Amino acid sequence: LIRFLLAGRPNKVKEQAKALRNLIKSTVPLIKSLAEEADASHLIRHEGHLTVYRGEADFAKDRGGWELRRLNGVRTQILSADALRDFDPNLSHAFTKGILIEENGHTINPQGLVTLLFRRFIANGGEFVSARVIGFETEGRALKGITTTNGVLAVDAAVVAAGAHSKSLANSLGDDIPLDTERGYHIVIANPEAAPRIPTTDASGKFIATPMEMGLRVAGTVEFAGLTA
């Protein structure tokens, strides 16, 4: 966790914020394009993300973060108490201020979206191999194959996208990536009596409520306990 703490220094935060913005700023239009090709557009919502506050003192704690977003080109809209109620009548009157990120989007069914994308991948000629990756075969600096429990797959290039397990795979290729697990937890409330109209973060409560196809998903707890915990 030492490297994690060091990454929280102000100069590092600014560097990482810029890098993350460049990495993710095109994700919504890109996933919308993929979803359209996979007949999954009905599972994508592009309605924004709302963060709500219980007064100015509550908002002041986040002011630096919002300024950092602004400097990196994130467009936001500040909503007063009345504007909040006009935007979403289901919100509690305890919230007196909100900030809307208009360009954000979300999926109402992650499993359904991935399933349809996978079907399109197969329909386009993709091949699915169920095996555990053990390592790689290289020739100089060139990648020649992926060693799996089902044999070696000959490749010219590969994308390492194995979540927290990517660290050991990258290490085998000589890349030392400061990567560890961040487990997230959520609950889903089926048939809620009321729900926010878009994903909404309670800033002081430190949780996000997201309307989903299967109900209202409430998330906000994470755990740093290592890969083998």
Enumerate the predicted regions with their spans.
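Active-site substrate-recognition segment that forms the wall
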Residues: 1-6, 43, 135-145, 152-229
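Dinucleotide-binding Rossmann-like beta1-alpha1 core, especially the glycine-rich loop
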Residues: 1-80
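Short beta-strand/turn micro-motifs at beta-sheet edges
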Residues: 39-40, 86-90, 205-208
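Short aromatic/hydrophobic contact patches that present stacked aromatics
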Residues: 49-51, 98-100, 186
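Helix N-cap/beta->alpha junction signal
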Residues: 55, 110, 162-163
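Helical element adjacent to the flavin cofactor pocket in flavoenzyme catalytic cores
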Residues: 60-72, 84, 91-157
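Conserved beta-strand segments of alpha/beta enzyme cores
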Residues: 75-77, 127, 176
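C-terminal catalytic lobe of FAD-dependent flavoproteins
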Residues: 76, 110, 203-204
